[in-house]
From Swiss-Prot:
It catalyses: tRNA(Asn) + L-asparagine + ATP = L-asparaginyl-tRNA(Asn) + AMP + diphosphate + H(+). GO terms for molecular function: asparagine-tRNA ligase activity; ATP binding; catalytic activity, acting on a protein; nucleic acid binding; transferase activity. GO terms for biological process: asparaginyl-tRNA aminoacylation. The gene is asnS. Belongs to the class-II aminoacyl-tRNA synthetase family. It is found in: Cytoplasm. GO terms for cellular component: cytoplasm. This is Asparagine--tRNA ligase. Keywords: Aminoacyl-tRNA synthetase, ATP-binding, Cytoplasm, Ligase, Nucleotide-binding, Protein biosynthesis.
């Protein structure tokens, strides 16, 4: 095969021309003198049509019948070079069709495990390396790619510098009970939960920084929203106020949604996502409500017929049902701000005049997707941070570099983090986070 290849996504530019595409066969149908071949090449899906009389006319009866028979006997996931004339076809769900003039098999495929019938989740996860080839899984990966692309674009446009934090660390950024421990030349080390502590050092040097990479949480959770390994975007910035931080977070999430609408509209169509809802999340302002007001709202509505959550008192943390109700009540992504210090991280700065609450926010996505962003202002006063660590019984020697940041020109600063998989799940409208990452790592799954 010496002809120049084109991608399926570009066929609209070649109407009336003969092209060659490298692709995999996803399905075939037809009978008698006609064969339909469903194709994919990673960029999009497409249909080719082969007519027996055309093959006989072009190649002669013996060769034409032989070539046509090869097409009729194609198996699912056989890889091929297929040549044909691109034609517009309003009847086709693709808008275009390929009038096949030649086909060459590259790699055979026999007894492909994932047939068009329904399969159980465990079977599909055991064959994740193959399940990724399906239309919906490819669509989710395209949305993931669009979100990652939009992340880099947004932070570049807003003056942030990419700042890489280490994967191995000797201390915890969050809950120390959720750490994966490993041996580091005879000393204990831990897989990173977050790059935040190191990003704060970056913010003191470069002003605005962000990190994007894998993080690890040893949570023994089986919910549809948790992974033990996932990709986190963390951002840190100096000299911004709490309200300015919320403005930045809102702009970022809206940029991600817009990025998917711009770069992966066909993926949203495949997943049958409510695009009008996504557009509304861009145009309407996000809601902001204090933790205490949210608790009061929950208490006022807990007797409603359509509620399904446990009673909470002021000082209690939300569960998933509470987060779902809050975001659905407002109908748009909702910031819950100023949580109790009692169950938030040691580094969060107290609300001025109210040390029981901290300057933080969780962004809750509507439609039942829950928290997608967590952020806060950081305690920038050395003495106050030391006092908090002493109160919690923390070993300050493990955080000497972090405390140094408060000793040499400390400034007001804050940051936030977003689990990319949660954002992908929300924008794609999928039911489980395991589909938002190529190879999910969960409580009872570490392969393939």
């Amino acid at each position: 095969m010496s002809k120049k290849l084109i991608s399926i996504v570009d066929v609209k530019d070649y109407v009336g021309q003969e092209v060659t595409i490298g692709a995999w066969v996803t399905n075939k149908s037809g009978k008698g003198k006609i064969a339909f071949v469903q194709l994919r090449d990673g960029s999009a899906f497409f249909q080719g049509v082969a007519f027996k009389p055309n093959f006989i006319e072009k190649y002669g009866e013996e060769s034409g019948l032989e070539k046509f028979d090869v097409i009729k006997r194609l198996n699912q996931e056989t890889s091929v070079y297929v040549t044909g004339i691109v034609k517009e076809d309003e009847r086709s769900k693709f808008g275009y069709e390929l009038d096949i003039t030649d086909l060459e098999i590259i790699g055979e495929s026999h007894e492909y495990p994932i047939t068009p019938k329904e399969h159980g989740t465990d079977f599909l996860m055991d064959n994740r390396h193959l399940w990724l080839r399906s239309r919906k899984q490819m669509a989710v990966m395209q949305i993931r790619n669009a979100i990652i692309y939009a992340t880099y674009e947004f932070f570049d446009q807003n003056g942030f510098i990419k700042f890489d934090s280490p994967i191995l660390s000797e201390n915890a950024a969050e809950d120390s009970t959720e750490l994966f421990e490993t041996d580091y030349f005879g000393k204990p080390a831990f897989l990173s939960q977050s790059g935040q502590l190191y990003l704060e050092a970056g913010a003191m040097a470069l002003g605005r920084v962000f990190d994007f990479g894998p993080v690890f949480r040893a949570e023994k959770s089986k919910t549809r929203r948790h992974l033990t390994e996932f990709w986190m975007m963390d951002a840190e910035y100096s000299f911004l106020s709490h309200e300015e931080s919320l403005d930045l977070q809102e702009a970022y999430v809206k940029a991600l949604i817009q990025g998917v609408l711009d770069r992966a509209p066909q993926a949203l169509d495949i997943l049958e996502r409510d695009v009008e809802a996504l557009k509304r999340y861009i145009t309407e302002p996000f809601k902001r409500v204090s933790y205490d007001d949210a608790i009061t709202l929950l208490q006022e509505h807990e007797a409603d017929e359509d509620t399904d959550y446990e009673h909470l008192e002021h000082g209690d943390d939300f569960g998933s049902p509470h987060e779902t109700w809050i975001s659905n009540y407002f109908g748009v992504p909702t910031f819950v701000v100023n949580y109790p210090a009692s169950f938030k991280a040691f580094y969060m700065k107290p609300v001025p005049g109210n040390p029981e609450r901290v300057l933080c926010a969780d962004l809750l996505a509507p439609e039942g997707y829950g928290e997608i962003i967590g952020g806060s202002m950081r305690e920038d006063n050395y003495d106050a941070l030391v006092a908090k660590m002493d109160e919690l019984g923390m070993d300050k020697s493990e955080y000497d570099f972090y405390l140094d940041l408060r000793k040499y020109g400390s400034v007001p600063h804050g940051g936030f983090g977003i689990g990319i998989e949660r954002m992908v799940t929300f924008v794609a409208g999928t039911k489980h986070i395991r589909e938002a990452i190529p190879f999910p790592r969960m409580l009872h799954r570490i392969r393939p």
